[in-house]
């Protein structure tokens, strides 16, 4: 199963999309994104996220063209919305760090799920467009602190604020979960607020 996510990561790295030349591999040592983070993000999406519906369960492979298009639309939108962080190395910004890649991958899956609820509406497309992803990412942009300031993650069970400086976030599952849950929860909150107005 691991081979296919790796193949998709290569397609992104050596294609013409926003991630071209950005994923660090043995053959592309100048990339800024750890290939392991990108492969993990793709693997999670294939298992139960936006890429799942393009899979062929019999082979574990799937419609590469549609998968690459969805990933390119999303990461192009990330580049637009977080343009100040896009060219920074992970030590200067957590956007293209393992934390950012994996948290945003989960958000991509959530945005896609919301998008599927609009099936049948005028102008609906099977794959969310770049513009759609930009609109949806802008909902959570003000909450992000990829390269400066602090993240305000709410409060813990004792009512104490959970505040983390941007550069305190490490590529650890607890930090990745913290950012992922925060972004997904606030995205859903924003979507629901729209529906109810």
In which residue ranges do the predicted regions lie?
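Accessory terminal alpha-helical modules
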Residues: 1-197
């Amino acid at each position: 199963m691991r081979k296919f996510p790796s193949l998709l990561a290569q397609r992104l790295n050596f294609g013409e999309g926003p991630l071209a030349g950005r994923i660090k591999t043995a053959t592309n040592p100048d990339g800024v994104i750890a290939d392991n983070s990108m492969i993990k993000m793709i693997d999670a999406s294939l298992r139960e996220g936006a890429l799942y519906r393009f899979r062929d369960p019999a082979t574990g492979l799937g419609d590469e063209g549609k998968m690459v298009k969805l990933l390119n639309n999303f990461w192009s939108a990330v580049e637009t919305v977080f343009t100040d962080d896009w060219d920074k190395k992970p030590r200067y910004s957590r956007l293209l760090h393992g934390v950012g890649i994996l948290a945003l991958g989960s958000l991509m899956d959530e945005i896609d799920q919301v998008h599927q609820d609009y099936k049948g509406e005028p102008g609906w497309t099977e794959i969310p467009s770049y513009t759609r992803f930009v609109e949806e990412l802008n909902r959570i942009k003000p909450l992000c602190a990829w390269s400066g300031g602090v993240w305000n993650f709410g409060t813990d069970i004792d009512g104490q604020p959970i505040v983390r400086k941007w550069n305190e976030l490490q590529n650890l599952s607890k930090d990745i979960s913290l950012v992922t849950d925060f972004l997904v929860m606030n995205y859903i909150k924003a979507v629901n607020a729209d529906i109810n107005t």
